[in-house]
Amino acid sequence: YTELEKKIMDDTGCKIYSGTGINNRLETQTTILRSVDDTPYYKDDLSNPCNISYTLCGQIGDQDLNHMLNKTMLDPKKIKNIYLYRKVLENGKCMGYMWYGKYELDRNNIRQVIHPDRNGHQRKIYLCTLTK
């Protein structure tokens, strides 16, 4: 394992994988979120690490709060712990990862905005607020 993977396992009790950006672990009521720099079809804002905007799951067309990954993450009975890490890109090349740690999800502050999808078409996306 890399040092970051070891840190994530130590902090969360969970292993991560490189698939989707929302990794729900129901057995530990934990979600590990990944934000990737310069992803034009998402609108993540990590400029203030204490108050982050994170785009929910869905790359093409309108996002759906009932999408399995979104619905599970937003359910306070299923998910109690939320963590975030960032994939740092420079000119499209992965330069490494940054661990942001544990956050609180403000489930009452889910905002819908218009933003391009993976194909460049305007669509509705959802942004959630993560706070330290």
Could you tell me what each predicted segment is?
Residues Y1-G96:
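Acidic, glycine-rich low-complexity segments with interspersed aromatic residues
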Residues K93-K132:
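Compact mixed alphabeta submodule
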